[in-house]
């Protein structure tokens, strides 16, 4: 999701460092810096020099077509934006919809027998699925990206809950139920999740 619910003014400092780093190494194109955040400090992990799976949420709150910009850069054209042109508006959340058991992540190949995606203002679905599509046994589990936006995190979560309830995929197992469960957990709603949140939540669920 974007913007992060875990940081405040530190994000602005970090972003300036990312821009400075790109200028220093002469990087020109789309890229993503990844950090871990703990106790008021952020720690650099890596830079991915490509368009990320999560790019739709950035597009939704900036209004910038990141894929289009990357294609333009690859063609030798200049970027259409400067750093001061980038303004965040609202909040966006992305749920990766995978063809797998929602709680043990066992792959679920098969034929899509029935399929309906949510829509409307504030909802975006990126997918290649259609009714009758066969998911082979050798595959990437990602079958769709469901995004929801709102003027703040609370409304984005509410929008996502509705969108997930309207997402229908029959013929295979998928992780929509997992997303529905997670978006109702108080820790998630309060923004208190961590990199260990999912594994801890699943462990607690199995004990019940």
Model-identified regions with their sequence ranges:
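Catalytic cores of soluble metabolic enzymes centered on carboxylation/carboxyl-transfer
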Residues: 56-208
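Conserved metal-phosphate-binding beta-hairpin within the catalytic cores
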Residues: 26-52
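Short amphipathic alpha-helical segments
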Residues: 15-23, 71
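Glycine-rich phosphate-binding loop of ATP-grasp-fold ATP-dependent ligases
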Residues: 9, 32, 55-58
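Single conserved hydrophobic/aromatic residue that forms the stacking wall/gate
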Residues: 1-13
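Solvent-exposed alpha-helix faces
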Residues: 11, 19, 161-165
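Secondary-structure transition/capping motifs at alpha-helix termini
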Residues: 23-28, 38-39, 151, 170, ...
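Anionic group-transfer/hydrolysis microenvironments
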Residues: 12, 36, 48, 96-98
């Amino acid at each position: 999701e974007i913007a992060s619910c875990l940081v405040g003014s530190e994000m602005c400092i970090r972003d300036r460092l990312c821009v400075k780093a790109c200028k220093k190494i002469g990087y020109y194109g789309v890229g993503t810096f990844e950090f871990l955040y703990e106790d008021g400090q952020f720690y650099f992990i890596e830079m991915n020099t490509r368009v990320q799976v999560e790019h739709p949420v950035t597009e939704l709150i900036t209004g910038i077509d990141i894929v289009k910009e990357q294609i333009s850069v690859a063609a030798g054209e200049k970027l259409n934006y400067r750093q001061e042109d980038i303004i965040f508006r609202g909040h966006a959340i992305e749920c990766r919809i995978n063809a797998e058991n929602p709680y043990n992540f066992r792959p679920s190949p098969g034929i899509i027998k029935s399929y309906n995606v949510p829509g409307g203002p504030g909802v975006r679905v990126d997918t290649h699925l259609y009714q009758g599509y066969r998911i082979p046994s050798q595959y990437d589990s990602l079958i769709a990206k469901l995004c929801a936006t709102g003027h703040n995190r609370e409304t984005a979560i509410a929008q996502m809950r509705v969108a997930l309830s309207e997402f229908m995929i029959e013929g295979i197992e998928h992780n929509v139920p997992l997303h529905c469960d997670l978006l109702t957990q108080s820790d998630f709603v309060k923004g208190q999740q961590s990199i260990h949140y999912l594994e801890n939540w699943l462990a607690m669920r199995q004990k019940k």
